[in-house]
A protein has these predicted regions:
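Exported/periplasmic ABC-transporter solute-binding proteins
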Residues: 21-271
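Bacterial N-terminal signal peptides that target proteins for export
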Residues: 1-7
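Bacterial N-terminal signal peptides
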Residues: 7-16
C-alpha cells in the first residue's frame, strides 16, 4: 500500500512540475521591446490566463536570437531581422528562425531639451554619429562638444541605426555605449551637449526632445507613411511556427487587444 501511495505521490509531483513548466513562458532579447511593451502585454495576458508566469530578459536583440538558436527561450524579441549567419547557425542545430512582426517603430534622435537646435538633416545625423562633426556649432547649434550616446553592440537598434542613418559606417570613436533606451534618455537628459537615439516609446523621458529629421518627426503617422526615415519593424522570433503558450502569446500580441497596448506604449500597430 505504501508503494502505491509513493507511486501516486511521485506521479502527482511530476504532473505538477510539467504543468508549471507548461504555464511558464521564457522570452529573451530586445530592450526596445522588453523594457516596456512586452511586460505590459504579459500583464494583460496573465489577467486573461491565470497561472501563467513570464521570465522576460531584455538584454538586446542578439541575445534573443541566440536564445532561439540555443533553445533557452520560447520567444526571442528582436528590433532587427536575424542575420544570414544567425539563420544558418539555427539551421545547423535543426532550428527554423520564424519571424513575426509585432509592431513598427521609429528610431528617434534625441537631444537635451535645453539644446536650441530645432531639427537635423539626414546628412547631419550621419556626420554627428560617425564623428565627422564634433561641435554643435557645425549643425546650427550654439556651440559645445557633442557627446554621442549609442546602444551596445548586442542591440538591434545599434545595428539598425547604423544601417538606416549612417550608411553602415562606424560610430564615432568617443561614443558612449549604453545598455538600453532608458539609459540613453537619462544620459542625454543630464548632458546639455548630449545626443542619442531611442525607440518612440522612450521619447517622453524627462529632459530630452526628439529631433525632426529633414522636417519629419517620429510619429505613428510618419512611420506608417514611411516619411520618417528611421522607421523599422520589430519582431518575435520562434523556432518554426509557435505552439502552445508561445502561440497564444504571439496571437494575443498581434490581435486587437495586444495591438491596443502596442499603441498605448508608444509603438505603431501593424494594422
Amino acid at each position: 500500500m505504501k508503494m502505491k501511495y509513493l507511486a501516486l505521490s511521485l506521479a502527482l509531483l511530476v504532473a505538477g512540475i510539467a504543468s508549471a513548466h507548461a504555464d511558464r513562458l521564457v522570452i529573451k532579447g530586445s530592450d526596445t521591446l522588453g523594457a516596456k511593451l512586452v511586460p505590459q502585454l504579459a500583464e494583460q495576458f496573465k489577467a486573461q490566463h491565470p497561472g501563467t508566469t513570464f521570465d522576460i530578459a531584455a538584454e538586446g536583440s542578439t541575445t534573443g536570437i541566440a536564445a532561439i538558436i540555443d533553445g533557452t527561450a520560447q520567444i526571442g524579441m528582436s528590433s532587427r531581422r536575424a542575420k544570414t549567419s544567425e539563420v544558418g547557425a539555427a539551421a545547423s542545430k535543426g532550428k527554423n528562425m520564424k519571424p513575426t512582426i509585432v509592431a513598427f517603430d521609429g528610431i528617434a534622435v534625441i537631444v537635451n531639451s535645453a539644446n536650441p537646435i530645432k531639427g537635423l538633416t539626414k546628412k547631419q545625423v550621419e556626420q554627428i554619429f560617425t564623428g565627422d562633426v564634433t561641435d554643435w556649432s557645425a549643425v546650427g547649434g550654439s556651440g559645445g562638444k557633442i557627446s554621442v550616446y549609442t546602444r551596445n553592440t548586442s542591440s538591434g537598434t545599434y545595428s539598425d541605426f547604423k544601417e538606416l542613418a549612417m550608411k553602415k559606417r562606424d560610430y564615432a570613436g568617443g561614443s558612449q555605449k549604453m545598455a538600453g533606451n532608458e539609459q540613453i534618455a537619462s544620459e542625454v537628459g543630464k548632458n546639455p551637449n548630449g545626443v542619442g537615439y531611442v525607440g518612440m516609446a522612450y521619447v517622453k523621458a524627462g529632459g530630452v526632445k526628439a529631433m525632426p529629421i529633414d522636417g519629419a518627426v517620429p510619429s505613428t503617422k510618419s512611420v506608417q507613411a514611411h516619411s520618417y526615415p528611421y522607421w523599422r519593424p520589430t519582431f518575435y522570433y520562434t523556432n518554426g511556427d509557435p505552439s502552445g503558450l508561445a502561440k497564444d502569446f504571439v496571437d494575443f500580441t498581434v490581435g486587437p487587444g495586444g495591438q491596443k497596448i502596442v499603441a498605448q506604449v508608444g509603438f505603431v500597430p501593424i494594422k
